[in-house]
C-alpha cells in the first residue's frame, strides 16, 4: 500500500525555497509484505531486487500528481530522460522515463488510481498493482485488512460507511492495542437513535470534496487587478480543510488540498501552480461546462447537427475572415466588437429551439480516492508501542512528531532531473552580461536591471506561448478533420477569438525590448517603448470579454466530439505544452496584462529621479489600469449574460413567470447564487431533499429545487419569483441543528496534531435567514446556511440590491407633511387639500383641523383646531360653490369655506345637516353639473341620493356666521336611485354613473335609472371573472378613450363598448389594494403595507413605497378642486426619534410626468 511520509516542519507557500525543502521530506512509498522484493535504486541509476519491502520514491509534483509504472522491463535507467514537473518556484520534482512509464490519468500525489484485478495482486512479477473492492467488502469488514496488506492502491470512489461500519473496520486491525491516527479521527458510535451528521472520513477524498464545497464560500476575488467570479483564496481553502479534518496543522491541510488539486477539483486562476496557503493566490473550481440539452447531440465525429451555437454567421466580404484569424501580421483585420453580442444572440436562438434531451452531465467535478497519510496502518502487527517495518507508517510519523524529530527522506541524495529547455535558460540579468558590467553599477541599478530583464524575458515567453497556440492548436485544427468542416472556422474564431491580434502587437513589443537589451547591456529606459505600444492594447479587452464564451464552447466541443477530446489529450501531453492544459494558455493574455503594472512598478521603484522613466512609467501604468477596468467590466457582462442564458434553459416555470423575469433583457443581472436548506437539521443528517438553489437577480429572488423532468435536470421554481422591493430579510437566532449531542472526550490529552478524541461529531450549527414576503399572498420562509459568512453575504447582497432598486426607481417622491405629535391623544381619519394645495383640512376623532403649507418644502405648519365634531371620516371641498362637505357619524354636513378663515373656533351649530345614514359620499362632474352622491348602502340594497349644487348661490359670500346659509341650501336633491346590491364605489361619467359592486361595474342612467353591466357579456375573455367571487372593484379611470378597471386582485382595459382591449395587457397586483389613484403614466395601488406603482401603458412594476397601515386620503383628481394632490396616511413608527410624519404627499417630478391622458 502507498504510504506518505511528511516532514513535520512548516510548509511556507510564499517561500519557494522553504517549500522545496519541506517537500524533500515528503515521499510516497509502495510497501508490500516481506515475501515480496524491493526495487532499490543504485548509484548507477538501475533498479535491482531486494528481499525487503518495496519502496519507490516519487516526490510531490506541483503540476501533475500522476504516478508512473514500468510497462514491462524491471531494469532501466531513469536518468536518461526526466524533466521538472513542478510549477514556478515550487521546487518539487519527479523523475520519469517515457520509454518505460505510462501515465495514469487519475492518479494523484497520494497514490489514488484506477483499480486493477485481484489476479494481478497475486503475481509477484507485477508489483505495481491495484485492487478494487465493493461496498459489501467494506460493510462486512471481511476484505479490508487484506486489501490494506496486499494492495498498492484502493479503488475510488470510496463508499460512505453506514452506521457503525467504521468500528467494524477498526476491529480487524488486531495488532492495534491503543488508539491510533484513524481511530482518533473517527468518532465512536453509540446506540442512540437520534439523527447524526454523516461522518466525514478525512482520508476519503470524495467525502472531503463534498464537504469542502459545502463549507467554502466563493465569491468575487481580485488578483493583479483582475476580478475573478466564484473564486476563493488559498488560505481560505486551507482553513476549511483544517476544519473538516479537525486539525490545527496547516501543513497537513495544505497537503490534503493538493490531493484535491491534483485531480483538478480546482485550479489556480493562472493555471501556473498548485494550491498555496496564501492570501494572494486565487483559485476557482473546475467546472465541466456541459452544453444545454439539445446542443450536445453530436456523435463522435461531431457532425450530427449544424452547430450555430456561440458563433457569428459568415457575411459576404467580411473583414474578419478565417485567414485573418491565423494571421499575426501588422495588418490583421479588426474583429468586430459585436462578436460577443452576436454570439450570445446565437445562444438565445439555439436555446429557443431545444427539444427534449437526456439529462446534461453534472457541472461539478469531485475527486475520488484515498489520502493515505490519514489512514490506518495496514500491518496487523503494528501498534503504537511496536511499529512495523514501513518507514512511511503513520504511527512512525506520529511518533516522530511527538519527539519533534525530523522525518527523514528515503533517499539521502534525492533524485536528479533534467529540466525543460525553457527552464534551463538563464533568468538573471547578471548571468547574461559580462561580469565587468555588473561590477560597474551600484546595487540599486543592479536591482533595476534585473527587473527590466524580467520584463523582457517574460514578454518573450508570452509571445512564445501565443505562438504555441498558433502552431499546435489554431493551424492544426484549421487543416485537420478534428472539427467538422461546417463548424471549424466558427469554432476557432469563438475559442481563440482575436488572440493573433494580441500576438501581432506583443511580438513587436518583444522585438523592441530585445533589441534594446542587445544594444544596451544596461538598459536606460523602457517607458518610451511601452508608451508606443500600450495604446494598441485594445485587443486585450475584446479577447478578455470573450473568454467566458471561449471556455464554454471549448468544454462543449470536448464533451460532444470524441475526436477533439482525444486531440486535446494528446497535445496537452506534448513536451511543448509543458504539462499545461489549453485553458492555462488561453488565460495568459489577460493575466499578462495584469502583470504589467506589477513589473513596471518594480522598475519605477529603483529608477533615479532624473531618468525619463519616472514620468513615462506612471503614465503607462495608468493606461494599463484603465484597460484592466474596461476588461473587468466587459468580462463581467459576458459572464453574466452567459449565466442568465443557462439559467433560462434550466429553469422550469410558468410562461407568465418567465415573462416576468425577462432574463433576455440586456440590463438583467445575476448577482449571487448558492444553495441553502429548508431545515436546519438537513446539515446534520445529510438530507439533500431540502436543498434550495437561490438565484439573486437584480429584480427578483428565485428559490428553486432540482427536479428531473423528461430525463432532464432542471431548476423548478419552489415559489413564484419574489420581487426584491417586497422582500424583508432578517436573521434567525442561531441554534444548533438537531443531531447527536457531543460526548465527553475519552482523554483530554491530544498528542497527535491531527487527532481528536473519540466522540460523536458535534452538532452542525445552522445559521438561519428569515424571508418575509409582503403582499396579498405574503408568506414567511426560513432558510439555513452552514456558515456565518454565507448568511451575511446573502443578507448584504439582498439589502444592497434593494437600496439600488429604490434609488434607481425613484419615480414618486414621498414627503412627510404632518407629524403625529400634532395629534397627541387623537387619530387622523381623513384629509383634503384646497386653495391650490396651499391649505389642508384634517378630520380626526375629535374634530376638524386646518393648516397652511410652507412654500419651501410643502410641509405643514402646526394645525389649528377649528371645529369640534366627533369621528369625521370624510372631507370634500367644492371650491366653485365655496362649500365644505363633512361626513361624521354617518351624517353628511355642509359648511361654507369662508367660515374657516375666521380666527375663532367654529360652533357646531353652524353646520347644516344634509342627510343621514350615509356610508360614503362622492363628488363629481356629470351632465354639465356638479353632483354630490350620498351612498346609503346595506348588504342587500343601496340608495344613491344625488344632490346638485345650486348655481344661484355660486360664489356668494356669507354675511353672517350665525346663519351662514341664510334660508337657502347649497345642495338640492337632484334624483334618487335604488340598487338591489351593495355599492362599493361610485364614478362619474359624462352623462351616467358607474357603480362598483361585488358583481362588478354597472352603468346607471340618471334619467331613467336603467342598469346595465359595463362589461359586455358576449366577450368570452371575461370568463375568468365568473370564478372569482372574492374580488371587488376598486376604481375606474378613463385613459385615452378606454376605461382602466381596477379590481382588488388585478386591472385591465375595456373599450367604450365593454369589450376587453389590449388583450396582452394585464396587471396582477402584488397586494390587495384598498384604493387606487392615477397620475399618468402611472397607476398607484394603495395596500396597507405598501404602495404599488406601475406604468399604466406597460403594466411594469416601477416602484414600491413601504409603510404601515397605509390609507389613501385623496386620489388627486382635481376636476373640482384645482391642483389635486395625492395624500396618504401611515401609522407612526414606534419609538422613533425626531419627526414622525403620518401624512405624506406623493410628488411626481416634472421629468417623470407625461401629462394628462384623459
Swiss-Prot record:
Q: In the UniProt record, does the keyword Cytoplasm occur?
A: yes
Q: Indicate the segments forming the CNH domain, all copies.
A: 825-1120
Point to the regions of Low complexity compositional bias: 68-81, 132-141
Record localization: Cytoplasm
| Region entry Disordered, spans | 42-141
Q: Which Pfam families match?
A: CNH, DEP, PH_5, RhoGEF
GO CC list: cell cortex of cell tip; cell division site; cell periphery; cell septum; cell tip; cytoplasm; cytosol; division septum
Q: Which positions carry Phosphoserine?
A: 746-747
Question: What is the predominant subcellular site recorded for this chain?
Answer: cytoplasm
Q: Where is the PH domain?
A: 670-805
GO BP term, example? regulation of ascospore wall beta-glucan biosynthetic process
DH domain span: 447-634
The molecular function terms in GO held by this entry are: guanyl-nucleotide exchange factor activity
Biased composition regions of type Polar residues, renumbered to the chain: 45-63, 97-108
Q: Which UniProt keywords apply?
A: Cell cycle, Cell division, Cytoplasm, Guanine-nucleotide releasing factor, Phosphoprotein, Septation
The domain of life is: Eukaryota
Coiled-coil intervals, chain numbering: none
PANTHER family per record = RHO1 GDP-GTP EXCHANGE PROTEIN 1-RELATED (PTHR46572), RHO1 GUANINE NUCLEOTIDE EXCHANGE FACTOR 2 (PTHR46572:SF3)
Tell me, what does this protein do in biology?
A: Stimulates the exchange of Rho1 and Rho5 GDP-bound form into GTP-bound form. Controls septum formation, cell wall synthesis and localization of F-actin patches.
**Name by which UniProt lists this protein:** Rho1 guanine nucleotide exchange factor 2
Q: Which organism is it from?
A: Schizosaccharomyces pombe (strain 972 / ATCC 24843) (Fission yeast)
The organism's taxonomy opens as: Eukaryota, Fungi, Dikarya, Ascomycota, Taphrinomycotina
* Record gene name: rgf2
Amino acid at each position: 500500500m502507498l504510504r506518505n511520509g511528511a516532514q513535520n516542519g512548516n510548509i511556507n507557500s510564499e517561500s519557494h525555497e522553504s517549500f522545496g525543502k519541506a517537500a524533500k521530506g515528503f515521499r510516497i512509498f509502495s510497501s508490500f509484505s516481506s515475501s515480496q522484493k524491493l526495487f532499490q535504486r543504485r548509484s548507477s541509476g538501475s533498479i535491482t531486487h531486494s528481499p525487503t519491502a518495496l519502496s519507490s520514491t516519487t516526490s510531490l509534483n506541483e503540476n501533475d500528481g500522476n504516478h508512473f509504472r514500468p510497462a514491462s522491463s524491471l531494469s532501466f535507467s531513469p536518468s536518461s530522460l526526466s524533466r521538472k514537473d513542478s510549477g514556478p518556484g515550487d521546487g518539487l520534482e519527479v523523475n520519469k522515463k517515457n520509454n518505460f512509464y505510462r501515465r495514469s490519468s487519475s492518479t494523484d500525489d497520494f497514490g489514488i488510481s484506477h483499480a486493477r484485478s485481484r489476479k494481478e495482486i497475486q503475481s509477484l512479477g507485477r508489483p505495481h498493482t491495484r485492487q478494487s473492492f465493493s461496498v459489501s467488502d467494506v460493510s462486512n469488514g471481511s476484505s479490508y485488512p487484506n486489501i490494506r496488506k496486499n494492495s498498492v492502491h484502493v479503488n475510488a470512489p470510496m463508499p460512505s460507511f453506514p452506521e457503525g461500519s467504521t468500528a467494524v473496520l477498526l476491529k480487524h486491525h488486531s495488532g492495534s492495542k491503543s488508539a491510533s491516527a484513524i481511530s482518533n479521527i473517527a468518532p465512536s458510535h453509540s446506540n442512540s437513535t437520534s439523527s447524526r451528521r454523516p461522518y466525514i472520513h478525512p482520508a476519503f477524498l470524495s467525502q472531503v470534496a463534498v464537504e469542502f464545497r459545502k463549507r467554502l464560500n466563493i465569491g468575487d476575488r481580485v488578483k493583479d487587478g483582475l476580478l475573478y467570479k466564484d473564486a476563493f483564496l488559498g488560505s481560505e481553502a486551507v482553513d476549511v480543510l483544517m476544519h473538516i479534518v479537525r486539525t490545527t496543522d496547516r501543513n497537513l491541510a495544505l497537503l490534503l488540498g493538493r490531493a484535491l488539486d491534483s485531480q483538478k477539483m480546482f485550479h489556480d486562476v493562472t493555471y501556473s501552480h498548485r494550491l498555496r496557503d496564501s492570501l494572494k493566490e486565487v483559485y476557482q473550481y473546475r467546472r465541466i461546462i456541459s452544453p444545454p440539452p439539445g446542443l450536445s447531440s453530436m456523435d463522435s465525429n461531431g457532425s450530427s447537427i449544424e452547430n450555430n451555437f456561440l458563433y457569428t454567421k459568415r457575411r459576404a466580404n467580411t473583414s474578419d475572415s478565417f485567414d485573418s484569424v491565423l494571421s499575426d501580421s501588422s495588418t490583421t483585420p479588426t474583429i468586430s466588437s459585436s462578436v460577443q453580442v452576436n454570439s450570445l444572440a446565437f445562444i438565445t436562438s439555439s436555446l429557443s429551439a431545444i427539444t427534449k434531451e437526456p439529462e446534461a452531465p453534472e457541472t461539478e467535478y469531485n475527486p475520488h480516492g484515498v489520502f493515505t497519510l490519514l489512514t490506518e496502518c495496514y500491518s496487523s502487527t503494528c501498534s503504537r508501542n511496536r511499529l512495523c517495518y514501513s518507514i512511511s507508517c503513520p504511527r512512525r510519523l506520529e511518533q516522530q512528531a511527538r519527539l519533534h524529530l525530523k522525518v527523514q527522506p528515503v533517499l539521502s541524495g534525492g533524485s536528479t532531473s533534467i529540466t525543460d529547455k525553457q527552464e534551463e535558460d538563464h533568468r538573471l540579468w547578471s548571468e547574461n552580461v559580462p561580469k565587468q558590467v555588473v561590477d560597474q553599477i551600484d546595487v540599486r541599478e543592479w536591482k533595476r536591471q534585473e527587473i527590466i530583464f524580467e520584463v523582457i524575458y517574460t514578454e518573450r515567453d508570452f509571445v512564445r506561448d501565443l505562438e504555441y497556440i498558433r502552431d499546435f492548436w489554431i493551424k492544426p485544427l484549421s487543416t485537420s478533420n478534428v472539427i467538422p468542416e461546417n463548424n471549424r472556422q466558427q469554432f476557432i474564431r469563438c475559442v481563440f477569438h482575436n488572440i493573433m491580434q494580441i500576438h501581432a502587437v506583443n511580438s513587436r513589443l518583444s522585438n523592441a525590448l530585445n533589441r534594446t537589451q542587445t544594444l544596451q547591456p544596461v538598459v536606460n529606459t523602457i517607458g518610451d517603448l511601452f508608451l508606443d505600444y500600450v495604446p494598441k492594447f485594445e485587443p486585450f479587452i475584446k479577447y478578455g470579454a470573450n473568454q467566458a464564451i471561449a471556455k464554454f464552447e471549448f468544454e462543449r466541443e470536448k464533451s460532444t466530439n470524441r475526436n477533439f477530446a482525444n486531440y486535446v489529450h494528446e497535445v496537452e501531453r506534448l513536451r511543448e505544452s509543458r504539462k499545461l492544459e489549453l485553458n492555462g494558455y488561453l488565460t495568459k493574455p489577460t493575466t499578462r496584462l495584469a502583470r504589467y503594472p506589477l513589473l513596471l512598478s518594480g522598475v519605477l521603484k529603483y529608477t533615479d529621479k532624473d531618468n525619463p522613466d519616472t514620468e513615462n512609467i506612471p503614465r503607462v501604468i495608468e493606461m494599463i489600469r484603465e484597460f484592466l477596468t474596461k476588461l473587468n467590466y466587459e468580462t463581467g457582462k459576458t459572464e453574466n449574460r452567459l449565466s442568465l442564458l443557462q439559467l433560462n434553459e434550466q429553469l422550469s416555470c410558468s410562461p407568465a413567470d418567465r415573462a416576468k423575469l425577462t432574463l433576455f433583457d440586456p440590463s438583467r443581472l445575476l448577482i449571487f447564487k448558492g444553495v441553502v436548506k429548508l431545515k436546519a437539521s438537513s446539515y446534520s443528517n445529510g438530507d439533500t431533499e431540502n436543498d434550495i438553489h437561490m438565484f439573486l437577480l437584480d429584480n427578483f429572488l428565485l428559490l428553486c429545487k432540482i427536479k428531473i423532468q423528461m430525463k432532464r435536470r432542471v431548476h423548478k421554481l419552489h415559489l413564484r419569483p419574489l420581487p426584491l422591493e417586497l422582500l424583508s430579510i432578517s436573521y434567525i437566532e442561531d441554534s444548533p441543528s438537531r443531531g447527536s449531542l457531543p460526548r465527553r472526550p475519552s482523554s483530554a490529552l491530544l498528542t497527535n496534531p491531527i487527532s481528536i478524541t473519540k466522540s460523536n461529531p458535534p452538532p452542525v450549527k445552522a445559521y438561519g435567514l428569515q424571508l418575509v414576503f409582503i403582499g396579498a399572498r405574503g408568506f414567511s420562509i426560513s432558510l439555513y446556511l452552514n456558515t456565518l459568512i454565507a448568511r451575511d453575504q446573502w443578507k448584504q447582497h439582498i439589502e444592497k440590491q434593494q437600496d439600488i432598486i429604490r434609488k434607481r426607481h425613484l419615480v414618486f417622491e414621498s414627503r412627510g407633511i404632518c407629524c403625529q405629535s400634532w395629534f397627541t391623544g387623537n387619530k387622523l381619519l381623513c384629509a383634503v387639500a384646497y386653495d391650490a394645495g396651499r391649505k389642508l383640512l384634517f378630520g380626526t376623532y375629535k374634530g376638524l383641523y386646518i393648516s397652511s403649507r410652507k412654500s419651501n418644502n410643502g410641509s405643514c405648519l402646526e394645525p389649528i383646531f377649528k371645529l369640534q365634531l366627533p369621528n369625521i371620516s370624510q372631507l370634500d371641498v367644492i371650491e366653485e360653490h365655496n362649500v365644505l362637505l363633512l361626513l361624521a357619524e354617518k351624517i353628511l354636513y355642509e359648511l361654507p369655506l369662508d367660515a374657516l378663515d375666521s380666527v375663532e373656533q367654529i360652533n357646531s351649530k353652524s353646520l347644516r345637516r344634509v342627510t343621514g345614514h350615509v356610508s360614503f359620499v362622492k363628488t363629481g362632474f356629470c351632465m354639465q353639473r356638479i353632483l354630490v352622491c350620498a351612498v346609503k348602502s346595506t348588504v342587500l340594497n343601496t340608495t344613491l341620493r344625488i344632490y346638485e349644487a345650486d348655481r344661484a348661490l355660486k360664489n356668494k359670500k356669507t354675511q353672517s356666521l350665525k346663519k351662514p346659509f341664510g334660508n337657502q341650501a347649497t345642495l338640492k336633491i337632484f334624483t334618487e336611485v335604488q340598487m338591489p346590491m351593495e355599492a362599493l364605489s361610485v364614478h362619474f361619467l359624462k352623462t351616467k354613473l358607474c357603480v362598483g359592486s361585488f358583481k362588478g361595474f354597472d352603468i346607471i342612467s340618471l334619467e331613467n335609472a336603467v342598469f346595465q353591466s359595463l362589461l359586455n357579456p358576449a366577450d368570452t375573455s371575461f370568463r375568468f371573472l365568473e370564478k372569482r367571487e372574492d374580488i371587488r372593484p376598486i376604481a375606474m379611470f378613463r385613459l385615452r378613450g378606454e376605461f382602466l378597471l381596477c379590481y382588488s386582485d388585478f386591472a385591465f382595459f375595456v373599450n367604450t363598448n365593454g369589450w376587453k382591449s389590449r388583450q396582452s395587457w394585464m396587471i396582477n397586483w402584488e397586494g390587495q389594494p384598498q384604493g387606487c389613484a392615477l397620475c399618468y403614466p402611472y397607476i398607484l395601488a394603495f395596500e396597507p403595507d405598501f404602495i404599488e406603482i406601475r406604468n399604466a401603458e406597460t403594466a411594469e412594476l416601477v416602484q414600491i413605497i413601504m409603510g404601515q397601515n397605509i390609507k389613501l386620503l385623496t386620489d388627486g383628481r382635481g376636476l373640482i378642486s384645482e391642483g389635486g394632490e395625492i395624500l396618504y396616511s401611515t401609522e407612526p413608527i414606534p419609538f422613533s426619534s425626531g419627526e414622525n410624519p403620518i401624512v405624506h404627499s406623493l410628488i411626481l417630478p416634472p421629468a417623470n410626468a407625461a401629462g394628462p391622458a384623459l
